[in-house]
């Protein structure tokens, strides 16, 4: 019997009895509210930077990339800290609070440098919360349905990511393109998320209270993260190099002539498809080979980038954004589930911190590079480069399937 067959046989009775914890839904609602707050701001921010503050596309790319790199640097520490102290919720609450408070800087910004500070401060909050939150979700979700759990949280997050741009469009229309007013109103759901988190999430007791050492992380601990874990990290990083910030989708819409008040519609399209796909494909990740599903997602991303590179009309740009959202729904939950399954329970915070660090550094390089390519070669060059890197993931996965030296597939 192969490793995959053994895992499937062992998981079969577990799947029949397993059900999602209420904590998963509450964490999803918290993500929905903060996602709505962020999307109301970020759906307009690239155009705000270019048209109001006079920033270049290169500057937009550097701001987005620097923000993601900052998030990644913080995530590794917060993940390790949550493992060391044996508590997840305090760090999750701290992270959401930092993000909500630091969003006050956006409506006050008078220069691109202030926006950069605001983005970094906001992303520090995201960095503090993400790895402990994902580790908490993994802690309360049985392995057999972990893909479903992450898929549900991503699906609820994308509900907020859809509602945010819709609210921004309505408010921009009613206010006569008053960016700052929209940014002020966007603070409300962000602060609401903190209340839901404090009241609704019940953290389980620490299952390893006697295993904390003098150091938060030791060489022995890293040795427990085996080859399947590092293989998943490598693929996730390469994949992220081809998937830069959605801010470039907004700029693409503005580039083809969409009015500032309506550019968030491109995010509505993307996140609507993402929302519809995340939970079903999260469940699918519990039932089929995850490398195959990642390969399908990579192929969809190649198609999306090729379409966006050549799109000159709103409907083609919208179709490209829809494909972009589909690949996010196909891939997002399965990467998190694969990392959770490959890491020991007491090192899950560390594992997600490493994942987020790798993905964030790759996203920084992708966004900064996309901004430079856009400035000197136009939108087509940025999206074409993304397609090439997404195709590289497909090549890696094919190598994994055909090479005897590659780690075994499955969970």
Map each language-model feature to its residues.
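Juxtamembrane intracellular "pre-TM" segments in multi-pass secondary transporters
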Residues: 5-21, 203-235
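Helix-loop boundary and gating motifs at the non-cytosolic
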Residues: 14-68, 229-266
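Transmembrane alpha-helix termini and helix-breaking/packing motifs in multi-pass membrane transporters
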Residues: 47-52, 163-181, 365-381
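Helix-to-loop junctions at the C-terminal end of transmembrane segments
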Residues: 74-86, 172, 277-289, 374
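Structural signature of the two symmetry-related core transmembrane helices
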Residues: 90-104, 187, 292-307, 387
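Cytoplasmic helix-loop-helix junction between adjacent transmembrane helices
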Residues: 118-157, 338
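Glycine-rich segments within core transmembrane alpha-helices of 12-TM secondary carriers
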Residues: 151-166, 358-366
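C-terminal membrane-cytosol helix-exit motif in multi-pass small-molecule transporters
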Residues: 187-209, 396-401
């Amino acid at each position: 019997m192969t490793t995959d067959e053994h895992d499937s046989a062992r998981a079969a009775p577990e799947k029949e009895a397993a059900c999602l914890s209420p904590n998963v839904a509450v964490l999803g609602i918290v993500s929905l509210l903060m996602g709505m707050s962020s999307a109301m701001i970020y759906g307009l921010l690239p155009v705000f930077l270019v048209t109001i503050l006079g920033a270049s596309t290169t500057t937009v790319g550097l701001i987005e990339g620097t923000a993601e790199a900052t998030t990644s640097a913080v995530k590794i520490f917060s993940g390790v800290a949550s493992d060391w102290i044996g508590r997840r919720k305090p760090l999750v609450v701290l992270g959401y609070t930092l993000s909500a408070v630091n969003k006050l800087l956006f409506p006050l910004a008078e220069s691109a440098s202030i926006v950069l500070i605001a983005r970094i401060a906001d992303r520090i909050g995201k960095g503090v919360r993400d790895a402990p939150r994902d580790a908490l979700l993994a802690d309360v979700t049985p392995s057999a349905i972990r893909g479903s759990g992450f898929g549900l949280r991503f699906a609820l997050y994308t509900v907020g990511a859809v509602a945010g741009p819709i609210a921004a469009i309505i408010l921009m229309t009613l206010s006569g393109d008053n960016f700052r007013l929209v940014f002020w109103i966007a603070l409300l759901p962000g602060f609401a998320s903190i209340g839901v988190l404090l009241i609704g999430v019940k953290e389980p007791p620490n299952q390893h209270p006697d295993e904390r050492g003098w150091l938060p992380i030791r060489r022995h601990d890293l040795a427990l993260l085996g080859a399947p874990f590092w293989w998943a990290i490598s693929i996730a990083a390469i994949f992220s190099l081809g998937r830069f910030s959605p801010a470039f989708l907004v700029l693409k819409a503005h580039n083809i002539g969409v009015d500032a008040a309506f550019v968030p519609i491109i995010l509505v399209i993307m996140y609507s498809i993402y929302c519809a796909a995340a939970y079903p494909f999260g469940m699918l990740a519990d039932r089929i080979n995850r490398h195959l599903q990642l390969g399908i997602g990579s192929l969809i991303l190649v198609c999306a980038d090729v379409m966006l590179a050549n799109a000159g009309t709103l409907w083609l740009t919208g179709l490209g954004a829809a494909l972009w959202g589909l690949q996010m729904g196909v891939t997002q939950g399965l990467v998190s589930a694969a990392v959770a399954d490959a890491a020991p329970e007491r090192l899950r915070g560390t594992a997600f911190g490493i994942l987020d660090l790798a993905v964030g550094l790759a996203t920084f390089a992708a966004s900064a590079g996309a901004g430079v390519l856009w400035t000197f070669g136009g939108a087509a060059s940025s999206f074409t480069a993304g397609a090439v890197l997404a195709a590289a993931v497909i090549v890696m996965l094919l190598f994994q399937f055909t090479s005897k030296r590659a780690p075994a597939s499955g969970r």
